Structures are given as structure tokens and as C-alpha cells.
């Protein structure tokens, strides 16, 4: 598993087509906020396997799975590309 500081650095360094993100470490994960609006974009929670993270999105008033099929877990780079590309993450941002 990548260290917390390494994960933070990789998130910040990612190319975000809708503007940058501010990354806040909290509650066993990383919350991504839009630097343009301050809105919540996504939450990435490391699961302890290699560099895999669970991807969550802000839904109504809580973090939830971004689909109808349960938790979405993927390697960090794939998760960053997923969040950057999918417009529903940016609805509140």
C-alpha cells in the first residue's frame, strides 16, 4: 500500500480537466474539493491492498457508492481517471 503522503501527492499531481482539487485527509480517506467552487468532488478511501481505493461520491447529504452495484474499488490511478472523467462527481462542484 502506498503511504498516505504518497497518495496525497499523486492526487494533487493528477491532471484535472475541470480545474484542480484541494485534498483533505480525514476519517481514513481523502476528500477532494473543487478549487473553483469549493464543492465536494469525491472521496477516496484506501482499502489496504496495494494502492487500491474505494471511490465514493457526495449523494444528497452523505458519501455513497457511485452506482447501483455496491462498492467501487480500483487502483488509485484508475480511480483518479474515473473521477476526472465522470461528470456526476462534479455536479456539486
What are these regions (language model features)?
Residues 1-3, 57-93:
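Mixed-charge, Lys/Arg-enriched low-complexity segments
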Residues 33-57:
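Short, conserved beta-strand/beta-arch hydrophobic-aromatic motifs that form part
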Residues 21, 25, 30, 51-56, ...:
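Broad hydrophobic/π-residue packing in well-ordered secondary structure
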Residues 7, 40, 75-76:
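Amphipathic alpha-helical interface surfaces
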Amino acid at each position: 500500500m502506498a503511504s498516505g503522503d504518497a497518495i496525497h501527492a499523486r492526487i494533487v499531481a493528477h491532471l484535472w480537466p475541470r480545474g484542480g482539487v484541494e485534498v483533505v485527509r480525514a476519517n481514513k480517506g481523502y476528500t477532494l474539493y473543487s478549487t473553483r467552487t469549493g464543492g465536494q468532488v469525491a472521496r477516496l478511501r484506501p482499502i489496504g491492498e496495494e494502492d487500491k481505493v474505494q471511490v465514493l461520491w457526495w449523494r444528497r447529504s452523505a458519501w455513497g457508492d457511485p452506482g447501483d452495484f455496491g462498492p467501487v474499488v480500483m487502483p488509485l490511478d484508475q480511480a483518479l481517471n474515473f473521477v476526472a472523467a465522470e461528470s456526476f462527481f462534479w455536479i456539486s462542484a
